[in-house]
Amino acid sequence: MVKKAHVTTSVNGDEYEYLCEPGQTLVDVLRNELELTGTKEGCSTGDCGACSVMLEGELVCSCLVLAVETDGKSVETIEGMAKGDDLHPLQRNFLELNGLQCGICTPGVLIAAKALLERNPNPTETETRFWLAGNLCRCTGYDKIVRSVMAAAEEMRGA
């Protein structure tokens, strides 16, 4: 019998302690142990980006990260994006410009877009498309998503 690992991690600024199997993925723990179901599991192979989260400030596919790897580290998920009732500019622009439809890819796209804008507050359309290439959307295509990110970037710059 495999011994469970004790993990302490910060998720969206809140401290969590849990036990997990050594091979259990971060997306599984987020959804099933911590009940943070905004992060979606689409492919389990890192190809779709639906499970994108920030780990220690780096964009990762949480289906490829073992939960034990987050011990002592910080994780940011879609649940931490809004501040109370105030939506993040990306969330607001996605709603206003119809940058989402079914919602499966949306949390991962929003996390990836936030990571982009934290690194490059004034991306070109080409840079935005390149950055989001790891996030698959089968509903909208990408034009409305890219327009939403570009509008949020402009808003965040105060332009």
Q: What are the language-model segments listed below?
A:
Residues M1-A159:
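Signature of N-terminal electron-transfer/Fe-S-associated modules in redox systems
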